């Protein structure tokens, strides 16, 4: 196990112990839902299987439940529910940020798509086109852009709803990339790779 992963896990472990009883309850609930998804979620099991077949098996301990930085969430227009660390290969699930187990399932699936892309396609996360492609795929394949999720966000569309959601969320994510100078650059990156990346559903046969 890499030293980078150990350092990242230790930092998250330290954070987990600082939030009092409420934080511990959130982390316990997160772990319970995570355990269920790793046993029963079709999308999670499918991605875990294909990651293993590709030589990138994901041990359960590499999927970490921990509190996320509330100041970062407050500064974002899209509250954070998870993340993927290219350096360590670990996935973070933000304990206390999920309104349902289905929400966690979509988040974990999203981050596993990033991990799949990182493993198979050697993504350069500082390259905006690379980042945009993985965000398009992760948002499209994870269930993040289901109509019910969009309604919960207060976004109601009846024409090309899925595509518009994927595009919007991909632009938001790329805009947050440290290498991205502004939203316009993020939009250009998403537009440049849109056709090929939206059509690429690997390892799924179709959009989940």
Mark where each language-model region is:
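Short pre-active-site segment immediately N-terminal to the catalytic Zn-binding motif
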Residues: 91-108, 124-131
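Eukaryotic basic, amphipathic alpha-helical target segments in cytosolic regions
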Residues: 55, 116-124, 142-150, 178, ...
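Auxiliary, metal-adjacent structural segments of Zn-dependent hydrolase domains
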Residues: 2-101, 147-151
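Active-site recognition of the HExxH zinc-binding catalytic motif
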Residues: 106-118
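Surface-exposed beta-strand-to-loop junctions
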Residues: 84-92, 115-120, 166-170
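Pan-zinc metallopeptidase signature
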Residues: 1-28, 156, 160-208
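Post-HExxH zinc-binding segment in Zn-dependent metallohydrolases
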Residues: 120, 124-171
């Amino acid at each position: 196990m890499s030293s980078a992963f150990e350092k990242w896990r230790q930092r998250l472990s330290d954070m987990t112990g600082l939030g009092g009883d409420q934080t511990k309850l959130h982390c316990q609930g997160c772990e319970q839902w995570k355990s269920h998804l790793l046993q029963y979620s079709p999308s999670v099991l499918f991605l875990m299987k294909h990651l293993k077949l590709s030589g990138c098996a994901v041990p359960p301990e590499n999927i970490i439940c921990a509190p996320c930085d509330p100041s970062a969430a407050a500064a974002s227009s899209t509250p954070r529910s998870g993340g993927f660390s290219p350096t360590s290969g670990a996935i973070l699930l933000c304990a206390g940020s999920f309104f349902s187990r289905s929400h966690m399932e979509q988040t974990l699936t999203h981050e596993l798509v990033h991990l799949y892309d990182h493993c198979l396609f050697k993504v350069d996360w500082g390259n905006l086109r690379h980042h945009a492609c993985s965000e398009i795929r992760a948002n499209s394949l994870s269930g993040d852009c289901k109509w019910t999720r969009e309604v919960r966000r207060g976004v109601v569309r009846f024409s090309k709803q899925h595509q518009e959601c994927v595009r919007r969320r991909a632009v938001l994510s790329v805009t947050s990339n440290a290498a991205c100078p502004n939203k316009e650059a993020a939009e250009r990156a998403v537009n440049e790779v849109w056709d090929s990346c939206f059509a690429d559903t690997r390892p799924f046969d179709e959009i989940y």
